[in-house]
Amino acid sequence: IGEKVGTGSGPKVDVALDPLEGTTICATGGPNSLAVIAMAEEGGFLNSPDVYMDKIAIGDGLPPELIDIDDSPDKNLSRLAAAKKCEIEDLMVLILDRPRHAELIAKVRETKARVQLMQDGDVAGIIATTRLNRSVDMYIGTGGAPEGVLAAAALRCIGGQMMGRLVFRNDDERDRAAGMGIEDLNRKYSLYDLAN
């Protein structure tokens, strides 16, 4: 993060990459591990520290600003169901299978939406909400912030909506973020804030 590469001549660009997103998936022969690289004009990606990020994402072809990371799963799923002209119980929500998501999983299940748990790989999880794979309607959960930027870059290419917020577990992480130019530690990031 923040590493300078290249010869110094030519256009300046931001490069975001993860040589193996879903390491455990790959090691165990599971699906959806990815090698991911994205490029934008200088300043085009959120320069995020290696911390967690709360994320919510949906696919393309839907009314703008349909999701809000500050709203409950019930509100977000109600709006999504209305936009898709279906019932909430027809929706599939993908969530990383982590102890930290126990309350979130319970709240989504209370809405009667279906929950699919994944072991790893939230970039692939967010891409699964797009037209390329209509089996997932929404992705919600907390995962790595750099993966959030990569997922946002993918959605900018394929289409979709996403919001994120950095999550800090301690003062060291907050200080690191401030040192990287993050001024509002509670800021809600839109898709275009993450990857423009």
Where are these regions (language model features)?
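Short capping/connector residues at structural and topological boundaries
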Residues: 10, 30, 39, 58-63, ...
